[in-house]
Amino acid sequence: MNPMILTVAVAAAFLLGSVRPAQALVLHPDGEPNLAVWTDRPPKNVVGRWGGNASCVAVSPNCVLTTRHQGGGIGTLVEIDGVKYPVTQVWVCYTADLRLARLYGANLPDFVGLYEQTDEPGRQIVIGGYGVGAGAPLQANSRTYGYEWDDYASRSLRMGTNRIEDAAAQNELQEFTTDIVIADFDTLGPGGSTTYESIPAAYDSGGGWFIKTADEWKLAGLTRAVESHFEAGHANDPNYILYQSWFRKPDNPILPDPDTLDAVRISSYAQWINNTLPGVLPGDLNGNDHVDAVDFSIFALYWQRTDCRPPDWCLGADSEPDGDLDALDLAYFARHWLDTDPAP
């Protein structure tokens, strides 16, 4: 079994003194999955890049969830599947390190539902985020105990696995108070590690922790923080931070010493998210807040298709939804012809 490192968003301050905002995923050199052949995971396009320093997760055709500590807001560009969408509205969740953002021009085919159960501890997860990967191995007595974080220019989507170990309520980090779920970055081999064991690192804040239930992937957490390490004699001094992830003790690498990682606990905020999610303008198939000829051309592409499936139902053209595009869907589309959503 192979550990991977998930990084957090780059921030000036470090969370909880001994943890820091997450930035990216790091894996063991021989343990990174091939996303082209690894299918037991969420769709890659449910994870996006938030601005230039974090990640986010699509939870509707035009909205993403992310953390707050990395900054950004209205006007931030979110990149999903190679397309950049500007943020036009933001809703923040009370004191939590959590926000919902609406994307202009988005009608995303891939998005995930929320994991609303409170039985997360013990469940295996897939973690996804954009950020740096594993760099040089850290060794003592010819044993690897961790990894440097790779060059900060090396940012791409990475996915790995882990297992939620615990949960905590009202955890304070910077100016936020947030319910969290907690995992750790285990060593390779038998024990607590998972197949593609991973931990966040730079630019992974806001990336997803996903649980599979009834063959459906749901969002259980948003990467928030990882354990920090400092140069000797400079504990908790951000000027002497070590951009590393450990899974064994550096002074005795025979012994395990896994770094901790945590995420915003989605089940605690599911009601707020569901109540806040804005609706999608019926018939607006390209997400520009107008129902016009461009939307009709998209509708025509799917006309008489019989393979519309959740979550997107042929980009929303199958309005019933019942799996096919027929006269009833056309009548529904016509009823909303030239409708417009007012600017937020």
Give the ranges of each region predicted by the language model:
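Acidic glycine-/aspartate-rich tracts in secreted/extracellular proteins
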Residues: 69-76, 104-109, 130-135, 166-170, ...
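Chymotrypsin/trypsin-fold serine protease catalytic domain
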Residues: 104-199, 223-231
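Sec/Tat signal peptide C-region and signal peptidase I cleavage site
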Residues: 18-24
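Catalytic-histidine neighborhood of serine endopeptidases
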Residues: 60-61, 65-96, 106-108, 119-126, ...
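Cellulosome-associated attachment modules in secreted, modular CAZymes
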Residues: 277-344
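Positively charged n-region of N-terminal signal peptides that target proteins for export
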Residues: 1-6
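C-terminal subregion of chymotrypsin/trypsin-like serine protease catalytic domains
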Residues: 25-48, 54-70, 159, 194, ...
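Bacterial N-terminal signal peptides
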Residues: 7-17
